[in-house]
């Protein structure tokens, strides 16, 4: 399924995703930023021909931004028009302005509504950026797949969405929420898997350069960097090198393109020098030894 969408998944990930679909349980994906957690939901939605609804989490995320809110300007306009026309029936005005016509559906409510009959893939991205109060609310939603709008009543999902939750583990998410889900830790890919990813995503990158790129990135991840390069950065670096018509790595090229691979100046300053050259020598020696 994922391979059809050009996503190379480890067997353990493919298995837990299959079980999540069959058991109709949310899938909780945890791992470092840049390992491809978000991409899983995108590829899954495309493979199943389902709409993708994404709730991007952030500090301070509230119900109005995540679930629903009322279109207050339109409601006020309707009230003014009613007053201008001489309408005095307050109950009728209230029923009108608190109807579906003025309801703005945010991602949670969108995920519970499938007008075309196809339950969407609901991506709750970077849940660890929110607070415990929002976690508690989300736990309630995932328990029954329903939301109560006081003015309209309870809105239930005719078919529960396929839920993918991701976190970068900047803080621990409450156990109660995790227990509702199937869990999988998404790690950086092994060298062979990352090489295959480059072959698929950057087909113009020649084999020698692809192997050097992967070996270099794999070695970088063993260092105590502020932020290790993810798979997305590996792809970006291979793409940049290809656009520069490079066929192999050399110290000058590595120095010129580090900004596509590393995103913090302290990391760049450390690698852009003797340590980076030593790393490149080790890569070339290692690849030469393995043929």
What are these regions (language model features)?
Residues 1-291:
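C-terminal regulatory/interaction module of P-loop NTP-utilizing enzymes
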